[in-house]
């Protein structure tokens, strides 16, 4: 598969989970069933019952970042012990205070690079250290997280100097994200803050000054990373309600959101199905349905692991087959935006600057390289809008 992708000029980014493993992992099984003798016990954070008060197991250090969510778990077959698992009992956290874990995970990344993958989406990148409310935002934790990602990057660059790394740093406060991009740690992070803002802008039909805020963030991250930071834009992902559902089925609003993030700087990530308006609301199985290739429930290569109930409630219109020949479809809206992005250098690689039309119903900005500038203006409303363009403000 890798050879075929590379032959077509496609780079392959693999999802790599380094914060935790599955509870069926041989390391964890050995550690939790033989906690006194296992060489893997220190690969995890496992405590004896004598080290904590089971009757008062609700103090601040037992709360996850999201509030009253327990991070300590118990294994049914090993009473008298508990282990750290921020994402639940089935996903025990690895212990990065143990240098052996660093070595193991760097080896894992290098293994896949040697197989030919071009980079990694780094799952739960902010949770390597600091899963407690009372420590997660301290300078010490920020420094430890940054140091690990610098170490990891260095290890990956030994195999592939051009490796692409993007971190899942789910943090709305951009100041708290700075350590992750500082001095060559993670040069790419998913922009969760921007994603939420773009959905709000599209749905409310008001720009809310988001371009000015975005430029400030780019300046901040650019300075911290010595100019190496690249944004990674998206609308929703596999852990969130799908864009079309967030928009309550309003196709115009969903198209507006696409028009915004596909004309902004950065590496764009499209969650499959978004390009045809696939709906989906939590729980997870409803936002991870099969790709709707066909109008019917049958077709070559179509998985049947889960009936696409959101898809088929729309009569098959939410499919590639139904939309591919419709010039006004969501699919062709995405295709047109992506063709612009590929053909117009300023849209693909250019910087961004605010262009204020004075109309809150218009989102406008300049994309520019040294030899090209493009004015992007998106009408957020359902009505015709007239704006005046001043040549001296367009960097042209």
Identify the role of each PLM range.
Residues 384-396:
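Beta-strand-rich binding/interaction modules
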Residues 2, 6-10, 103, 154, ...:
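Glycan-processing catalytic domains of CAZymes
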Residues 6-10, 116-118, 160-163, 186, ...:
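Short, well-ordered coil/turn segments that N-cap beta-strands
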């Amino acid at each position: 598969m890798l050879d075929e992708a590379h032959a077509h000029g496609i780079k392959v980014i693999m999802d790599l989970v380094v914060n935790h493993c599955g509870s069926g992992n041989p390391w964890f099984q050995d550690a939790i069933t033989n906690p006194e003798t296992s060489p893997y016990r220190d690969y995890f954070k496992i405590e004896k019952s004598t080290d904590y008060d089971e009757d008062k197991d609700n103090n601040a250090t037992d709360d996850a970042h999201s509030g009253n969510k327990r991070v300590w778990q118990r294994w049914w077959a090993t009473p008298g012990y508990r282990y750290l698992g921020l994402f639940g009992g089935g996903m025990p956290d690895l212990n990065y205070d143990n240098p052996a874990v660093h070595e193991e995970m760097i080896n894992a990344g290098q293994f896949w690079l040697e197989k030919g993958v071009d980079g990694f989406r780094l799952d739960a990148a902010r949770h390597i250290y600091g899963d407690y409310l009372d420590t997660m935002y301290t300078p010490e934790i920020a420094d430890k997280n940054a140091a690990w990602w610098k170490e990891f990057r260095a290890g990956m660059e030994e195999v592939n100097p051009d490796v692409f790394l993007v971190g899942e740093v789910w943090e709305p406060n951009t100041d708290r994200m700075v350590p992750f991009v500082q001095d060559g740690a993670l040069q790419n992070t998913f922009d969760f803050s921007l994603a939420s803002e773009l959905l709000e802008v599209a749905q409310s039909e008001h720009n809310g000054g988001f371009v000015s805020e975005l430029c400030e963030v780019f300046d901040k991250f650019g300075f911290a990373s010595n100019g190496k930071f690249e944004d990674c834009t998206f609308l929703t992902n596999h852990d969130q309600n799908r864009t079309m559902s967030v928009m309550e089925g309003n196709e115009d609003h969903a198209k507006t959101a696409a028009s915004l993030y596909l004309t902004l700087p950065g590496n764009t990530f499209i969650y499959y199905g978004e390009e045809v308006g696939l709906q989906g609301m939590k729980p997870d199985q409803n936002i991870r349905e099969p790709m709707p290739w066909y109008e019917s429930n049958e077709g070559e290569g179509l998985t049947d692991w889960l009936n696409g109930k959101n898809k088929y409630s729309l009569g098959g219109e939410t499919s590639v087959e139904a939309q591919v020949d419709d010039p006004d479809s969501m699919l062709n809206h995405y295709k047109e935006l992506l063709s612009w992005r590929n053909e117009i250098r300023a849209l693909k690689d250019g910087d961004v600057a605010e262009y204020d039309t004075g109309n809150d119903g218009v989102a406008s900005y300049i994309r520019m390289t040294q030899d090209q500038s493009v004015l992007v203006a998106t009408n957020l409303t359902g009505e015709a809008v007239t704006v005046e363009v001043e040549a001296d403000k367009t960097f042209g």
